[in-house]
């Protein structure tokens, strides 16, 4: 029997893979008996931040990661492709239909027993995958800290508001994907210089909610928009509000652009791209309604701040996501030091493959470092002076000296060759 803690992206992926291999799995999920500050449903694999799984281009790092995962029959990608919504060259999903699908597949599997309880004690002698996500409970966090002799596990993260599509003024906003690449999948709210400066001033003077022990420890992928703005007046214009490739229908080039991405199949909800925030709700409404096209915006879900949890993994995990001092324990998902939805799911798949190898062959065959899955495992297990959670990127690979376009194709080819050899060697 294998114990898995957490039915998020990583835990669901690991449970499904192992159950399909014939193992009996006990999957612990404390929701809905005990909720978290960010989750709003009782479903597994709930997406609490964006609804985007990012690029589908296999010559993009996260696109390559998706290709690798399909070789292992990823449940998360299966669900995502069934319940995708238009997003240009990216993969985005209807978050509710997506998580409902994952939940049904897990709950209906004959080898998976779902237990809705908070895990408050851990046994070093049980095969355990800890995939409690970035919102692990205090009691579980304390158990992890005690067994691994840690001082801390916590940092804080923020999520973006969702807008009612009917309240968006399409006389001002317009549909377009950057550089007109693929279908016009984003709603764009353009600003001229004066509008941007007024918006920026309001953003910088908005009041934020922060817990007393907030340490301002955030990573780039989900940094609150107001914190990013504090880096400089033009930081947002070169980040989430960059206008390049988003020329207005009349040919005019905007000074800055706020993008909104479809959040559901019915196109009733749009989330604000890169607009994670922990502003107080009154200020959120005031600042958002200063954006041209959103002057009458109805906010369906306000941005919120919530606690995240992750290990300083290189001190504790090897490249199989296995705890060095407690070999029956594995960590997966954001708690293991990966960043991003697909990365979390991939780590769950990685752990499941490693545990299966350990139980059937008596040893682990880590995925090759020429694959993105293997490169990420190497990252979380190798020494870094300042370890931070990391998403998929080609910088994790052993570098190839070639022109950028050619280099990406070579990375892809090398990964597929390494993966083919790995699978042929027996999983």
From Swiss-Prot:
GO molecular-function term, one example from the UniProt record: tRNA (uracil(54)-C5)-methyltransferase activity, 5,10-methylenetetrahydrofolate-dependent
Short name of one Pfam family: GIDA
Protein name as catalogued: Methylenetetrahydrofolate--tRNA-(uracil-5-)-methyltransferase TrmFO
One annotated GO biological process: tRNA methylation
Binding of FAD, residues: 6-11
Signal sequence coordinates: none
Gene Ontology cellular component list: cytosol
EC number: 2.1.1.74
Disulfide cross-links: none
InterPro entries named among the record's database cross-references: FAD/NAD-bd_sf (IPR036188), MnmG-rel (IPR002218), MnmG_N (IPR040131), TrmFO (IPR004417)
Protein origin, superkingdom: Bacteria
Species the sequence originates in: Acholeplasma laidlawii (strain PG-8A)
